[in-house]
Amino acid sequence: NRYKSNVIHWKDFIAQGKDQSMNAEPYDPQHACVVVHTGGTTGSPKGVMLTDDCFNSLAHEFIAQSNLFCRGQKLMNVMPPFIAYGYACGVHMPLVMGLHVVIIPNLDPDKLGALIWKHKPEHMFGVPAHYQQMAASPLLKKKKDLSFIRNYAAGGDSLPLGAELTVNEFLKAHNVEYPLA
């Protein structure tokens, strides 16, 4: 195996960190923890460096909304983790908050309703099209109670008013307390 020299087995990784202190790494406010890729909406696509502080401040903003997010709840991430929205809101933030994360790395839009029903995530971050697909799901239309849904947030694109009304009417008709955020 040509990659053998680059592999660290899990047990070895854990053993190497056993006696390490968190203080071993000095704080650097400009440290970039991740490079994410833009879609090029306002120009050419590019890599953007995001700092530790950027990611952690986002997580702490959500922690401040403790009435909505509770340790042990489930968040389904249908956003690609290589974009800022998918990684920051769909991976880092929920893990910092103690949420269970269900990552769907390659979403088949026709299966979104089945995935929501299977995992019953209280939270989900997606783009407007995801929620339009959810509201059109034949499986979810048959279900009477989707009250497990607490916070489904849309970002990354605009949501036409008519589509937002359709999604929110669907949520209300299925016993969901909060509209799409």
Where are these regions (language model features)?
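Conserved structural elements of the adenylate-forming
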Residues: F13-Q16, Q20, P29, V48-F69, ...
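Conserved pre-ATP/AMP-binding loop-to-beta segment of ANL
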Residues: R2-I8, I14-H37, S44, N67-K74
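Short beta->alpha linker loops
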Residues: C54, L107-D108, A129, S158
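Gly/Ser/Thr-rich phosphate-binding loop
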Residues: P121-G126, A135-A181
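Conserved AMP-binding/adenylation subdomain of ANL enzymes
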Residues: N56-K74, F82-H123, Q133, S137-P138
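Short beta-strand->loop structural element characteristic of the AMP-binding/adenylate-forming
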Residues: K46-M49, N77, L99-N106, A181
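Conserved S/T- and glycine-rich ATP-binding loop of Class I adenylate-forming
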Residues: A32, H37-T41, L75, P81, ...
